[in-house]
Amino acid sequence: MIIKRILLIFIILLLLFPTANATILNLVVGDTIYPTRKHVSSLHKTIELDEVQVIGQRKLFSIRKDTTFINTDCLRVRKGANLEDLIRNIPGMEYDKANRQLSFKGKPLNGVNINGETFMGNDIIAALENMPTDAVELLKLYDMLSALEKMTGVDDGADNYVLDIKTKSTYNGSLTGTLTAEHGNRDRRRDEVQGNLFNADGENTSLTLRSDNLSNMNIGGNNFQNILSGNIVKKFGKKITLNASLSLNAFHNGSENHDYDEQYLSSGTKYRESMLLSLSKNHSNAANINLQYNIDKKTLLNISANGNFGRSDNLTDNTTYLYERNTAADTLTSGTLRNNTKSNGKNYHVSADLTRRIGKAGASFTVKATLGGNSNETNNTSLSLTKFHHLRNAVGGDSLLLRNLCQQLPTLRNESRISLQYTHPFGKQLKLQTGYGLHHEEDRNTSNTYDYTIPNRPYIDSLSYENTLSICGQELTLRMDYKGKQWKINSGIDVEWQRRNICRQHNSETVDYTVKATEYKPKFGAKWNNGKIEVELRYNGNTQQPSIQALLTLDDKSNPLSVKIGNPQLKPAYQQQLSIRLNERKYGITFMGNYHNSFNDFAEEVTYVPPPEQCVTL
């Protein structure tokens, strides 16, 4: 009987758990599920699953090789938020909107990409404001190589860390848009229309129109900011990629400030009260275009151009009272200063490079050319009136210091470079690059000052000048790039021999002379990574030449109370910076250290001239 029962149980188990090639799923949170075929025992039953749900804690950060991934599903933001709201919730991410700087764990980010392509011309503010959070699936942080660096295989040594956004598949190929109208008390408002079209291959189109008065804390009906921005990335087959962006910005801001402070001195307590009225009107227009053309597998052409034009009108009205006691009857000095500054500025930059690989080893030649410049015209009108109530003039009244000046400050700068580079590989991991180039630069700045207190507005020689600097140079570059399994080493040096011609006209005097100078720019970077710990060491050095004003022996009397005299014997200064960074991946711990110093730095010697025995006051 017992034997029959055992035999019956064995037959039932055999029917329920037949021998088969069952599919076993190895599940890991965050990984793709790959089925593996294994021969299993007859005691295992093949189960076909329609759905697998894995419940576990998601990680906000993950690191693979040199790329940091940020899982945005772990972050919560309000509905309709933009990318700026999202990054402010990321630990270690710092955003300084006033200085247009974005950094992660102390490392500056140079731009924002969409699916691997540049977004909004690397304008960080425009990218963060125009990207909706709902479209973001994943954020990636890495050091992005340019198309030229990928072609030659040599890193130029400059950090180019970017924030790359992977869009959700539901948004790819779909046109999305938002319409926002927010109005509150004290006439606060924000109106915005936005449209986006993203593709997984990096193509994207974005257009935003916004008008608001939330960009500053000053309340007023005339304060506003209007922005029109757009971006397009278009690929023509596999060879041509076009990237263009446009930004138009108008900003008006008025404010009123009242200050009061006390100074406790040995001679007695002083009280100061001031009122400042200011009005700023700024308009800026910027455009950027890049074209990448892969002519064939061995030839690459890059062309880029960008420029901007802006104008501003700033008016300030400042009134100040200084009391010996906190009563108006004991006023020591009182003054008013009205300053109006109007400026028109523009700059441009055009560059092109052509790279051709030769031979089977991967050697290449590169021709690079750049052309850039900027100009600015500034008109500054100032009216200053200061009364010294305890200092009597010749007729017994309060002494008066009156200034009514107009300064015209035009500046102009043009620069051009052309170079030839040769890259030679030594195996698959080591490459050497050498190059030779020519450099020309010309800077000119002028100050024309007029006295508006006199009806005919005479020209003031002592407060006017014209400076011109012309540089002709030859540049030699050497660079080494090594990429191994754990080590990445990049080092190089740029040496430029310059002929600098300096000319200055001031107070009917002219100085014109030529000097020779040599500039050194060494760079070194090493990174070691074993998968758990990453250690990075960087060194940068550069030669800094003294300014025109510091070299000229002519007296600079633009400020009568501080007359400056240059020193033609000044030598160049050398500045260097050493940084080390250690990143522990498991616990996300980062250590950073920086050291910088200067050799032969510039300093000013101050000599106080005693006042004359007799002073004439007006």
Predicted region positions:
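Flexible, surface-exposed loop regions and adjacent strand-edge segments
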Residues: 155-158, 259-268, 318-328, 382-391, ...
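Bacterial N-terminal signal peptides that target proteins for export
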Residues: 1-7
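Surface-exposed, low-complexity loop segments enriched in small/polar and acidic residues
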Residues: 304-306, 310-338, 366-409, 437-463
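Bacterial N-terminal signal peptides
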Residues: 9-18
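Membrane-proximal, glycine/serine-rich, low-complexity loop/turn segments characteristic
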Residues: 22-51, 57-317, 337-379, 419-441, ...
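Signature of Gram-negative outer-membrane beta-barrel scaffolds
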Residues: 405, 431-529, 538-539
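Outer membrane beta-barrel strand-and-loop segments of large Gram-negative receptors
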Residues: 275, 415-417, 459-465, 475, ...
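Extracellular loop and loop/strand-boundary signature of outer-membrane beta-barrel proteins
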Residues: 217-218, 272-277, 333-340, 401-408, ...
